[in-house]
Amino acid sequence: GSGGIGASITKLRATGSPLKSSFGGSSSGPTPFAKILDTSIRAVQRGGKKVGALCFYMENWHIDFPEFLDWKHNAGDDYVRMRTANTAAFLSDEFMKRVEAGKDWYMFDPAETADLNEITGREFSVRYAHYIEKADKGELRMFKKVPAAEQYRQILVSLQSTSHPWLVWKDTINTRALNNNTGTIHMSNLCTEICLPQDKENVAVCNLASLNLAAHIKNKEVHWGRLEESVRLAVRQLDNLIDINVLPIPEAAKSDRENRAMGLGVMGFADTIEQLGMAYDSEHAWDFADRIFEFVSYMAIDESANLAVERGSYKNFNGSMWSKGYVPIDTIKKLSEERGIAVTVDNQSKHKGLNWDLLRAKVKKGMRNATLMAVAPNANIGLVVGTTPGIDARFAQVFSRNKISGKYMDINHNLVKDLKNMGIWEKVREAIIENQGDISSIPHIPQHTKDIYKTAFTTSPLAYVEVAARAQKWVDQALSRNMYLETRDIDETMSIYTTAWKKGLKSTYYLHMKPRHTAEQSTTKVNKAE
């Protein structure tokens, strides 16, 4: 298919790197090869309606990384620009620590430092220091040296300008991987939520589904019994899907069959907390994220362990961290130890009644699936089912939708319902529409309601980090975490993304800057809320 593909290009030798097979010849670097893929992915369309989707991943010790940062810029030679594919920087803990310490960052030719691509954590740091020593002694053909903070700044300036490259943390992903016995994870996928190892014999495949959290709210409370049923059913459905999958290449079929990886996610988080009367940037919402993701994680793991009893464990189970009785939350401590810096997120259970020790003993006996959870962005299917996408805050309270039948206005039904219950909907309706859904300046609306119905750009960016950090504790793969910023202050942006790393996020997705976004209003006059 032409779905959401991730491609690591870190192994491609540097521009100007000597070729052994060509007398006096040298490599043209990663760009021309990436350009071939960029063009190819556009040529392959799904149903003739949607072009292919690809994200290139590069580790930032590659000497061509500065050129990689320019791939998504509009200006410049089209030959060195990627018009279809996306880009993501695969960053190590060593790099982040060098940024914090004000140290230099060295970039190398992978032809001389190939093992850096395969190692992680402290082992990477030791080997990286070895190559720095060799470079300083003149024992490497080519290298570059820049202040680490300067390169970090360049990454984030590019991110602000083009929304690329997305920031993904290699060591956080690999250190916390419960399927770490099957190799190094070199990349994520298009949407930065999949974390699976891959090599020439195994092309990673993940089978996804998303639960609508908002459909599990009854009388302003979570219907935990119904949610448990949904999680267990989804795990069984995805496991059944693996058995009937028809994949285009044998390497993908092999990986799918031997690892049985799935990624159960959620949508409607913002919709759910609105119904529960919580503001996205409140401690209540963060604790709720902690509890709901812990619950989903527990039930998904338990059902996979049940399936292992019924149908057998996945082929590569023995030797995995699952087989040693680990569950996702246990890897937070492992990450802190590997970094030598404590991950700044609480790793305690928040959901009473879940016996994790009992589940650890159960998991040790067998798991049907190598991975269980991954939170996709769900931008389209969230709209289709009438809820908010993934774990994102609501982008606007009023926006227009384009459908085959035409364009029409959509208003947040939770907001309308609350305002009607207060008896002020008719009084404030026109003001809300005129303000494009921004209710912050409308005097008749109580402050607690304004807090609940903040939109993406009026919500603190640190709230996005905190919600993701609370969820990531329990998720064995990753979360597609969009970020929304009003500020263009680069130091503030650096601080936000550094906080994300410190709190244990594995990845981030698009960065949306406020000046580039407006919610278009429908031209249809709205007299009544549907």
Q: What are these model-predicted stretches?
A:
Residues D70, Y79-I155, L159-T162, S336-G340:
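Polar, glycine-rich mid-to-C-terminal structural blocks
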Residues S230-A253, A279-N378, Q447-K450, S480, ...:
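Internal maturation/activation junctions in enzymes
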Residues G1-S22, S26, P30-F33, A43-G47, ...:
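Function-dense linear segments that define catalytic or interfacial modules
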Residues L91-F95, E100, E112, T120-F124, ...:
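Terminal amphipathic helices with adjacent charged low-complexity linkers/tails
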Residues G4-S8, G48-C55, Y106, W166-W169, ...:
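Flexible, glycine/charged-enriched surface loops at secondary-structure junctions
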